[in-house]
Amino acid sequence: MATPAVPVSAPPATPTPVPAAAPASVPAPTPAPAAAPVPAAAPASSSDPAAAAAATAAPGQTPASAQAPAQTPAPALPGPALPGPFPGGRVVRLHPVILASIVDSYERRNEGAARVIGTLLGTVDKHSVEVTNCFSVPHNESEDEVAVDMEFAKNMYELHKKVSPNELILGWYATGHDITEHSVLIHEYYSREAPNPIHLTVDTSLQNGRMSIKAYVSTLMGVPGRTMGVMFTPLTVKYAYYDTERIGVDLIMKTCFSPNRVIGLSSDLQQVGGASARIQDALSTVLQYAEDVLSGKVSADNTVGRFLMSLVNQVPKIVPDDFETMLNSNINDLLMVTYLANLTQSQIALNEKLVNL
């Protein structure tokens, strides 16, 4: 059975005093008020200078003007939304799996598709929004309309809730280096599920020689009684990762120094050796710092001193003979486990040959 899509059409641009992208409207048989209102500029008279100032984008902000669209009833993305307004000072923390998923969906996009879009999932606290997961959403774009498969997005979110019930809908992402008039229309749909949703852009075309990653929130702006516009305000983007994600990131970073951009998985012994080498380098740095402080080359820092003292106190005090006995015992256990594993493997191989006779 075909999955229903929600078509959205964008008519020709209507001039507005806001320097932004071409306005776009959403045709609907039954207009309805927006479910999640977005903070707008305070009302002011047309003769008030503050009203004219409200129509000018502030430095560092990306304006995109669009006529306030009439709401079209569409399948809603279920789940809790961002609590309250999204302050401009809040930080967006991205996990590596987000970037990997976006790039993978872009590489697997349909033939002729200019970009891909998807839903962002994560958690919210007082000072930051942490994006921990995402999934792509099928859509079709042309010069005058965009159709988004919201039923697919609803089903995918229901599946994600079964695995991670704490993840909320935070916004959406799109590949590309700019915000188009279609982005304003798609943003309206996500505004119904998350007040002031995040719009994440990932420049997969590498226009500036790197993959630019930016996050925005939208704000209504304009002169009362005139066509309202939408201004996308940039947010601070930082990167976060769990310990398990850090292992994958370190492995991917090693491909930067490989001529063919390919690197194999290291063995357990190589991982232990690499970790030991990093610990040795860290200890050398600490010893050099201590020597510089004692010689007067560097002024002493009480915070660093307390941290080093706490680190030294955490090291267990073991008699050298006891440590050697423990190490030899662990090595013997490891050798025994290895021997039993090889013996079991040989027995299984022998059994397979006897069965096939």
From Swiss-Prot:
Disulfide bonding pattern of the chain: none
UniProt entry keywords in alphabetical sequence: Acetylation, Cytoplasm, Disease variant, Hydrolase, Initiation factor, Intellectual disability, Phosphoprotein, Protease, Protein biosynthesis, Thiol protease, Ubl conjugation pathway
Superkingdom per UniProt: Eukaryota
Family under the similarity heading: Belongs to the eIF-3 subunit F family.
EC category name: hydrolase
Subcellular location: Cytoplasm
Pfam families: JAB, MitMem_reg
Post-translational modification: Phosphorylation is enhanced upon serum stimulation. Phosphorylated during apoptosis by caspase-processed CDK11.
Xref: PANTHER family: EUKARYOTIC TRANSLATION INITIATION FACTOR 3 SUBUNIT F, EUKARYOTIC TRANSLATION INITIATION FACTOR 3 SUBUNIT F-RELATED
Reported function: Component of the eukaryotic translation initiation factor 3 (eIF-3) complex, which is required for several steps in the initiation of protein synthesis. The eIF-3 complex associates with the 40S ribosome and facilitates the recruitment of eIF-1, eIF-1A, eIF-2:GTP:methionyl-tRNAi and eIF-5 to form the 43S pre-initiation complex (43S PIC). The eIF-3 complex stimulates mRNA recruitment to the 43S PIC and scanning of the mRNA for AUG recognition. Deubiquitinates activated NOTCH1, promoting its nuclear import, thereby acting as a positive regulator of Notch signaling.
Modified residues (N-acetylalanine): A2
Gene3D superfamilies: Cytidine Deaminase, domain 2 (3.40.140.10)
N6-acetyllysine: residues carrying this PTM: K238
Protein name per Swiss-Prot or TrEMBL: Eukaryotic translation initiation factor 3 subunit F
GO terms assigned for molecular function: cysteine-type deubiquitinase activity; identical protein binding; metal-dependent deubiquitinase activity; translation initiation factor activity; translation initiation factor binding
EC numbers: 3.4.19.12
An annotated GO cellular component: eukaryotic translation initiation factor 3 complex
Source organism of the structure: Homo sapiens (Human)
Domain notes: The MPN domain mediates deubiquitinating activity.
Catalytic activity: Thiol-dependent hydrolysis of ester, thioester, amide, peptide and isopeptide bonds formed by the C-terminal Gly of ubiquitin (a 76-residue protein attached to proteins as an intracellular targeting signal)
Gene Ontology biological process terms from the UniProt entry: formation of cytoplasmic translation initiation complex; IRES-dependent viral translational initiation; proteolysis; translational initiation
Domain MPN residue range list: 92-222
SMART domains for the chain: JAB_MPN
Disease: Intellectual developmental disorder, autosomal recessive 67: A form of intellectual disability, a disorder characterized by significantly below average general intellectual functioning associated with impairments in adaptive behavior and manifested during the developmental period. Some MRT67 patients manifest seizures and sensorineural hearing loss.
Chain segments carrying region Disordered: 1-82
